[in-house]
Amino acid sequence: MAWSTLVDPSPSVLTNPIPFPSGRGIVYVITDRRAAGERSLIDIVHAALRGGANAIQLRDKDVPARAMIALGEALLPLTRAAGVPLIVNDRVDVALALDADGVHVGQDDIPADMVRRIIGPARILGVSVATVEQAQQAARDGATYVSVGDLFGTPSKPDAGPPIGLTPLTEIARAVDLPVLGIGGITVANAASVVRAGAVGVAVISAVIGAPDPEAATRALCDVAAQR
């Protein structure tokens, strides 16, 4: 069955979405219940925002829409107060229900061009890519940014496949006129190499969500990501 038969392609307009951060030094934090353990994801995200995170992605592949919406409703006041966009992974329905600032999709999710038609021109659209061809297609589909990985191997996505390393990131950053983030196994120790390879910043899960002090961990990543 074609994707076009499953969704209404008419756009949804958000009056004042928070834009994707401009410039370099972006630290984009992705939520993960498993990495949080018994700690509150809301508290962790709040700490990350205090530490300087300038984009938050709500990601949870394993919970019903209602639970994801409930978490999003708790996070939105924090991100709005910080002037930071809240981007929903995969779930366009959840993003629209929340009036979130954007959606992020992978290569096996709803096609990016269809997501763009649904969410309208103002919201953020992120796409996961691993090759120049995928990044160029994302640009044609209306992506706001792309994330490139898995760079180093990550415990957060055991099905991500073998790490691709930094060379594809450099090639993608040269090939598309979009902000490029590195993702996959990024830590304070290797974040500088990601930025030197051409990324405008880093997307992280465990490095912040699983850190004993998420605020300090985010601040350290921000310091490294801002360096050239």
From Swiss-Prot:
Comment on bound cofactor: Binds 1 Mg(2+) ion per subunit.
Q: Which domain of life is it from?
A: Bacteria
Q: Which residues form a coiled coil?
A: none
Entry binding sites for 4-amino-2-methyl-5-(diphosphooxymethyl)pyrimidine: Q57, L58, R59, D60, K61, N89, S128, K157
Q: In which pathway does it act?
A: Cofactor biosynthesis; thiamine diphosphate biosynthesis; thiamine phosphate from 4-amino-2-methyl-5-diphosphomethylpyrimidine and 4-methyl-5-(2-phosphoethyl)-thiazole: step 1/1
Q: Which GO terms describe its biological process?
A: thiamine biosynthetic process; thiamine diphosphate biosynthetic process
Q: State the Gene3D superfamilies in the record.
A: Aldolase class I
> Which keywords appear in this protein's UniProt record, sorted alphabetically?
Magnesium, Metal-binding, Thiamine biosynthesis, Transferase
Q: Where does 2-[(2R,5Z)-2-carboxy-4-methylthiazol-5(2H)-ylidene]ethyl phosphate bind?
A: T154, P155, S156, G185, I205, S206
Identify the cofactor(s): Mg(2+)
A GO CC annotation given for this chain: cytoplasm
Enzyme Commission identifier(s): 2.5.1.3
- Bilayer-crossing residues are none
Q: Where does Mg(2+) bind?
A: D90, D109
Pfam families attached to this UniProt entry: TMP-TENI
Reaction catalysed by this chain?
A: 2-[(2R,5Z)-2-carboxy-4-methylthiazol-5(2H)-ylidene]ethyl phosphate + 4-amino-2-methyl-5-(diphosphooxymethyl)pyrimidine + 2 H(+) = thiamine phosphate + CO2 + diphosphate; 2-(2-carboxy-4-methylthiazol-5-yl)ethyl phosphate + 4-amino-2-methyl-5-(diphosphooxymethyl)pyrimidine + 2 H(+) = thiamine phosphate + CO2 + diphosphate; 4-methyl-5-(2-phosphooxyethyl)-thiazole + 4-amino-2-methyl-5-(diphosphooxymethyl)pyrimidine + H(+) = thiamine phosphate + diphosphate
What does the protein in this record do?
Answer: Condenses 4-methyl-5-(beta-hydroxyethyl)thiazole monophosphate (THZ-P) and 2-methyl-4-amino-5-hydroxymethyl pyrimidine pyrophosphate (HMP-PP) to form thiamine monophosphate (TMP).
Any idea what this protein is called?
Thiamine-phosphate synthase
What is the originating organism of this protein? Roseiflexus castenholzii (strain DSM 13941 / HLO8)
Taxonomic classification: Bacteria, Bacillati, Chloroflexota, Chloroflexia, Chloroflexales
* Gene coding for it: thiE
